[in-house]
A protein has these predicted regions:
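Repeated loop/turn-to-beta-strand initiation elements of outer-membrane beta-barrel proteins
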Residues: 578, 606-608, 648-655, 677-685, ...
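Transmembrane beta-strand segments that form the barrel wall of outer-membrane beta-barrel proteins
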Residues: 91, 551, 584, 608-616, ...
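Periplasmic polypeptide-binding modules associated with outer-membrane biogenesis and secretion
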Residues: 4, 28-626, 636-642, 656-674, ...
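Transmembrane beta-barrel wall of Gram-negative outer-membrane proteins
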Residues: 664-748
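C-terminal outer-membrane beta-barrel translocator/porin domains of Gram-negative envelope proteins
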Residues: 573, 589, 595-596, 607, ...
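Residue-level signature of outer-membrane beta-barrel architecture
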Residues: 645-647, 674-676, 691, 713, ...
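Bacterial N-terminal signal peptides that target proteins for export
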Residues: 1-13
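Bacterial N-terminal signal peptides
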Residues: 10-22
Length: 995
C-alpha cells in the first residue's frame, strides 16, 4: 500500500505528472485495480460537505471496480470545491462476507477562510483601527494562509512606522469556527510612543535657503520651535508644501521626495531626508493675447503635472485654443515655442493668433427627419449667443466634434447604421462680420430593423419574461447599442437568479428583406448557485434579531448579487453601522451552495456636534424699538450643540438632545426615535420634548414647553403620513400691543392637539427641483379631550409644482392655504385664539414682507397680531444667467395673513390704516449660485402695495400708561402716533430654493 499526498500548491504539477504515469501516483494501488470498492470513508468524519454531497460529486463510486483514473478524478473534484488544502488517499483490502474488495479512505485537511479582521489594543491615532485593518489587505471570505498573515503584519507595521510609531508591535491571534471553516483574525496592537521630527537633511540640487525649506515643511512649531510628533499626513503635507514653495518660484519641474526616515531610539526622534532637484525656473508667457496667470495654470497641464514635455505643452495649446474659442475667438490658433535653459531659466512662449472675435449667432440643423430639431439640440454642447449666460455663444472645434459624434450615436442607436453628419461654419452671417453660424447636415440613410430574433439556451428562466424585457425584438430598430442593452438585461436576470457564470453571445446576418437583420442570441447559463447560509459577524451591542429582520437572503435562495447588495444597503440604513462588508465565502470554489458573509462594524453610540452661526437682517419685534413695528436690522450670533445616543437597547433606537443658543432664542429639543416600529419598515415612532424661549422675534416674547408623540408611516416611495399628538404650554410676555389687550393676549396657552399630515413628494431633486409636484396637507384638532383649553381646528394645505420650459428654464409655483376655526367659545371672537396659535407669515412665504410681518396689526403700536387664515401664492421663472453655475429668478409673490377666512379677499387696495385683509403683491429678481448642498439664494423683492398702519412713537412706559386711547392721539396725550409702512424693498439670503 502506498499513500499519496497532494497539497494545493502542487496540485497542478500533480495533474501533469499523472498524465505521464499514473503508477507514479498510485503505484501500490495497482494491485487493487479492478477490485470492487466496498467502503469509501472520509477522515476526519466531520467534513465541510455533507455525506450526500461528497458521494454525489465523487467519480469513485461504492460497489464499482477500483480504477486509478477515478481516484485521480475524485481528488481533482474535491480540490475544485476549494474546501480542502490537503488530501491523502489510502487503500487497503477488505472482506465483506464472501466478497473481497478494498476500502478507500480520503484523509483531508480543511481549508480556512478569512472572517472578521479587527485591530484592538493600545492604538495611538493616527492611524485608526480601521486604517490598520485596511492595510492588512485581508479580504472577507478569501482563503486563509500563513503568508497572508505575515504580509498583513508587515503592512500594519509599515503603517505604524509611517506615522512615527516605530516601537509599535502587532500580534495576531485567531478564533476558529469549525462549522463554517472560518477564521476570525484579531491583531493586538501596542503602538508605543510616537517619535518626533528632527532637523531634516536636504540632499540634491536645493537652490533655496534651507531655513525657508524647513519653514515650509512645518515640522517645527511656530514661535516655540519645538518639533511636532510625526504622522503620515504631516510628512505628506510637508512634501506638498515644499513642492508648492518651488512652484511659487516658477520651478515647475522641481522634484521633492522623502529619501528616508531614520529612527533614533535613544531620543525617540525621526530624521527625515528630503531629496530635492529644484530644476530651472520656467516662465510661461503668451504672445499675441493677454491671458492671466491663473488661466494659464488652469489650462496648461505642466503646472499640475510638475513636468514639461511636448505632449503636455501640446495639450496646453489645445486647451488655450478651446478657451479662446469659448470666449468668441473662433479662429484662434495657438502654438508653443519652448526655449532652452539659459542661466537657470527657461521660457515657454505660447504664440496666440486670436483672429477676430465672433458671436455664434445661429446653429442650423438640416436633413433630420426621424428626430425633431429640439431632440437633437438637447444633446449638443454648442450654444447660440445669449445676453448674459453665453455672450458670444459656446463654440470650439472640440465641442463641434463632440456634437457630431453625439448625433451619430443617437441615430446609430436607433438603427441608422450608415448615418453621416457633416458640418461647416459660415462667417459674416447675414451680413454681420462678427457673426458666425454653424450648419449641421445630417444624412440619415436607411433605417435597419430586426426581422427575426432567435434566443437559444434559456432553460431555467421564464422565456416569455426574458423576451418581454428585450429591446431588439421583431420590428424594432436594430443597433449594436440595443444588443448591448439586451445583453445587460439578460445577464442581470441570470445573475439575480444565482447564475454567476452566465455568458451571452450574439451574431447577426442580413435578412432577405432589405434593411432587415436576423438576430441570434446564445446564452450559456452555467451552474446555478444558492445561499448555503448567511453568516453575520461583528455584533457587539446590536441585537441579532434586528439584523436578521433586514436580511433579504435566506438559506436555499438563489445567490443573487442584487439581493446581497440590497441587504448591505438596508443594514447601512439602520444607522448603527459605520461599515458593512459583504462577501461570498470561497467565491472560486466549484460548489452550488455558498456562504454569504456580512462583517459589521458598529458606529459610535455617542456623538456630539457643535456649530457656530449668525443671523443678519431685519428681525421684527424689537423690545426697544416701539417706533419700528417692522423690526430692526441687526447681527445675532448663534451657537448650537447636539448630543445623541445611538443604537439604544441594541435596536437602532436613538435619543438625542439638540440645543441652540442665541441672543434671540434659546432652544432645546429632546427626541426619542423608534424606527421600524412593530417590525414594520414603513413605521417610525418618535417622542419629543421641546423647550423654546424666544425674544425680539415676534410681537411678543414667549416660552414654549411641548411634549409630542408622532407615528410616521411611509405609504409608498413618495407618500408619507404623519400622525401626531402634542400638548404644549406657551406663555407670552412683553407684548407690544394696545395696553387693554395685554391681559387678554398674555394668558398662558395650554393646547392639546392631534394632527394628521400627508406629504407627497414627486420632485426630481428636493434641493433644486426641475419637474414634479410637492403636496402637503396638515389637519389638526385641538379639543378638551386632548387636554386643550381652547377648541379649534387647523387646516394647512400646500401645493407646489415644477414645469420645464424649453431646455433651460423652469416655471415653479407654490400655493398655500390655511384656516383656523374656533368652536366652543363664547367670548370675543377676535380674542378666541391665543397669539402663539395664530398664523404668522412673511419672508420665505411672501417676499413682500420681512419674517413674521404679514397680516393684521395692533391699532396702537402697529405690531403684527397674526390671523386665523392665510393665502400665499408664489411663482418663479428660473433660468440660467451666467455660465452653468449662476442662475437667475424672476418671481411674483401674492397673498397675506387674514384675520379670518370670512375676510379673505383678492382686492389689492388697503381701505384704511386698520385694514389688512387684502392681497399684497411683490415682484423681484433673484440670483442662484450652485453649490454641493443646494443653490445659494439671494432675492431682492419690491412690494407693490405694502400695508400702512399707525405706529407708536414713544417709550415702553408711555405705552403702558397710554390706556385705551386710539390713534390719532388727541392733544395732550402721553404719546404720539405716526404712520408707518412695510418697506417696498426687501432682501433675503439663504441656501436652497424658496420652495
Amino acid at each position: 500500500m502506498r499513500m499519496v499526498r497532494l497539497t494545493l500548491a502542487k496540485f497542478f504539477c500533480a495533474l501533469l505528472l499523472s498524465l505521464v504515469a499514473s503508477t507514479t501516483l498510485f503505484g501500490q494501488a495497482q494491485k487493487y485495480q479492478g477490485k470492487p470498492v466496498l467502503i469509501i470513508q472520509f477522515e476526519p468524519k466531520d467534513q465541510p460537505l455533507d455525506a450526500s454531497e461528497l458521494h454525489a460529486i465523487l467519480p469513485l463510486k461504492q460497489g464499482q471496480p477500483l480504477r486509478v483514473a477515478d481516484v485521480r478524478a475524485s481528488i481533482e473534484r474535491l480540490f475544485a470545491t476549494g474546501r480542502y488544502t490537503d488530501i491523502q488517499v489510502d487503500a487497503e483490502p477488505y472482506t465483506e462476507g464472501a466478497t473481497q474488495g478494498v476500502i478507500v479512505r480520503f484523509l483531508t485537511k480543511n481549508a480556512w477562510f478569512i472572517g472578521s479582521v479587527t485591530d484592538a489594543g493600545s492604538i495611538n491615532n493616527p492611524p485608526r483601527a480601521g486604517q490598520l485593518e485596511n492595510a492588512s489587505r485581508l479580504e472577507l471570505g478569501q482563503p486563509f494562509n500563513d503568508q497572508k498573515i505575515q504580509d498583513a503584519v508587515g503592512a500594519q507595521k509599515r503603517l505604524l512606522d509611517s506615522n512615527g510609531l516605530f516601537l509599535g508591535k502587532v500580534t495576531p491571534s485567531f478564533t476558529y469556527n469549525d462549522s463554517f471553516q472560518q477564521i476570525d483574525i484579531r491583531f493586538e496592537v501596542d503602538s508605543g510612543l510616537r517619535a518626533r521630527f528632527s532637523q531634516p537633511v536636504l540632499q540634491g540640487d536645493v537652490k533655496l535657503d534651507p531655513n525657508i525649506i524647513l519653514k515650509a515643511t512645518k515640522f517645527r512649531r511656530w514661535l516655540i520651535h519645538t518639533w511636532k510628533p510625526m504622522t503620515q499626513s504631516r510628512v505628506s503635507e510637508a512634501l506638498d508644501s515644499v513642492r508648492s514653495l518651488y512652484q511659487r518660484e516658477n520651478r515647475l519641474e522641481a522634484r521633492v521626495s522623502l529619501e528616508s526616515m531614520k529612527y533614533d531610539a535613544q531620543t525617540n526622534s525621526a530624521l527625515p531626508t528630503l531629496q530635492i532637484d529644484a530644476g530651472p525656473r520656467i516662465l510661461v508667457n503668451t504672445i499675441g493675447a493677454k491671458i492671466s496667470k491663473g488661466q494659464l495654470q488652469h489650462y496648461v497641464p505642466i503646472f499640475e503635472e510638475h513636468s514639461v514635455d511636448d505632449d503636455l505643452l501640446l495639450e496646453g495649446a489645445h486647451n488655450l485654443r478651446d478657451y479662446l474659442q469659448s470666449q468668441g475667438y473662433f479662429d484662434a490658433e495657438v502654438a508653443y515655442k519652448p526655449q532652452r535653459v539659459v542661466n537657470d531659466q527657461a521660457t515657454i512662449d505660447f504664440i496666440v493668433n486670436t483672429g477676430p472675435r465672433h458671436k455664434l449667432a445661429a446653429i442650423e440643423i438640416s436633413g433630420n427627419h426621424y428626430f425633431n430639431t429640439d431632440a437633437i439640440r438637447e444633446r449638443m454642447y454648442l450654444q447660440k449667443a445669449s445676453l448674459l449666460q453665453f455672450p458670444h455663444g459656446r463654440y470650439s472645434e472640440s465641442l463641434l466634434r463632440r456634437d457630431r459624434d453625439a448625433i451619430v450615436n443617437l441615430y446609430q442607436s436607433n438603427g441608422f447604421l450608415a448615418v453621416k453628419v457633416n458640418s461647416r461654419t459660415q462667417e459674416n452671417y447675414r451680413g454681420k462680420p462678427e457673426d458666425l453660424a454653424v450648419f449641421l447636415e445630417i444624412q440619415e440613410g436607411p433605417q435597419s430593423f430586426v426581422n427575426t430574433l432567435d434566443v437559444e439556451g434559456i432553460e431555467h428562466l421564464d422565456m416569455k419574461k426574458v423576451l418581454g424585457s428585450l429591446s431588439s425584438v421583431q420590428g424594432q430598430p436594430f443597433s449594436e447599442f440595443s444588443v448591448a442593452v439586451d445583453r445587460d438585461t439578460i445577464l442581470a436576470q441570470y445573475f439575480d437568479k444565482g447564475f454567476a457564470n452566465a455568458t451571452f453571445e450574439w451574431n447577426s446576418q442580413p435578412s432577405p428583406r432589405p434593411n432587415r437583420v436576423d438576430l441570434h442570441y446564445i446564452i450559456h447559463e452555467g451552474q446555478q448557485e444558492f445561499v448555503r447560509k448567511v453568516l453575520v459577524s461583528g455584533l457587539k451591542y446590536t441585537r441579532p434579531e434586528l439584523v436578521n429582520r433586514n436580511l433579504t437572503l435566506n438559506s436555499g435562495d438563489p445567490l443573487s448579487p442584487t439581493q446581497i447588495t440590497d441587504t448591505q444597503r438596508k443594514l447601512y440604513d439602520l444607522g448603527v453601522f459605520s461599515r458593512v462588508d459583504q462577501a461570498i465565502q470561497n467565491p472560486d470554489g466549484d460548489m452550488p451552495d455558498k456562504y454569504v458573509l456580512y462583517q459589521l462594524d458598529e458606529a459610535r453610540r455617542y456623538s456630539v456636534a457643535f456649530g457656530v452661526g449668525a443671523e443678519l437682517g431685519r428681525i421684527g419685534g424689537c423690545n426697544d424699538c416701539l417706533d419700528a413695528a417692522t423690526g430692526a436690522a441687526g447681527f445675532y450670533p448663534r451657537v448650537s450643540m447636539d448630543v445623541a445616543r445611538n443604537n439604544l437597547w441594541g435596536l437602532a433606537h436613538t435619543i438625542s438632545l439638540r440645543t441652540q443658543f442665541s441672543t434671540l432664542e434659546q432652544r432645546a429639543l429632546l427626541n426619542y426615535s423608534w424606527p421600524r416600529f412593530e417590525d414594520n419598515d414603513k413605521l417610525t415612532l418618535s417622542f419629543t420634548g421641546l423647550f423654546d424661549n424666544s425674544k425680539d422675534i415676534r410681537t411678543y416674547n414667549y416660552t414654549r414647553l411641548e411634549g409630542a408623540v408622532q407615528l410616521s408611516q411611509r405609504l409608498s416611495r413618495d407618500i408619507t403620513l404623519l400622525y401626531r399628538l402634542a400638548y404644549r404650554r406657551v406663555s407670552v410676555s412683553d407684548l407690544k400691543v394696545t395696553p387693554f389687550l395685554v391681559n387678554i393676549l398674555s394668558q398662558p396657552d395650554h393646547v392639546g392637539i392631534g394632527s394628521i399630515n400627508l406629504v407627497q413628494d414627486r420632485r426630481d431633486d428636493p434641493l433644486d427641483p426641475h419637474r414634479g409636484v410637492y403636496n402637503t396637507v396638515d389637519l389638526g384638532l385641538a379639543e378638551h379631550f386632548f387636554g386643550s383649553q381652547r377648541d379649534f381646528t387647523r387646516v394647512l394645505v400646500r401645493n407646489a409644482s415644477y414645469y420645464p420650459v424649453g431646455r433651460k428654464m423652469v416655471l415653479a409655483r407654490s400655493t398655500e392655504i390655511g384656516n383656523i376655526s374656533v368652536f366652543h367659545y363664547f367670548g370675543i371672537p377676535a380674542d378666541a385664539l391665543p397669539l402663539p396659535e395664530r398664523f404668522f407669515g412673511g419672508g420665505d412665504s411672501h417676499r413682500g414682507f420681512p419674517e413674521y410681518q404679514a397680516g393684521p396689526r395692533d391699532g396702537l403700536t402697529g405690531f403684527p397680531l397674526g390671523g386665523d387664515a392665510l393665502f400665499f401664492n408664489q411663482t418663479e421663472l428660473r433660468f440660467p444667467l451666467i455660465g452653468d453655475s449662476i442662475g437667475g429668478v424672476l418671481f411674483h409673490d401674492m397673498g397675506n395673513i387674514y384675520s379670518s377666512f370670512d375676510h379673505f379677499s383678492f382686492r389689492v387696495h388697503q381701505d384704511n390704516l386698520q385694514d389688512f385683509n387684502y392681497m399684497v403683491h411683490a415682484i423681484g429678481f433673484g440670483i442662484r449660485y450652485k453649490t454641493p448642498v443646494g443653490p445659494l439664494r439671494v432675492d431682492l423683492a419690491y412690494s407693490i402695495n405694502p400695508p400702512y398702519f399707525n405706529g407708536f412713537n414713544g417709550t415702553t412706559e408711555q405705552l403702558i400708561n397710554a390706556g385705551p386711547v386710539p390713534c390719532p392721539a388727541p392733544a395732550g396725550a402721553p404719546y404720539q402716533c405716526n404712520v408707518q409702512n412695510v418697506s417696498h424693498f426687501q432682501y433675503f439670503f439663504s441656501i436652497g430654493q424658496t420652495f
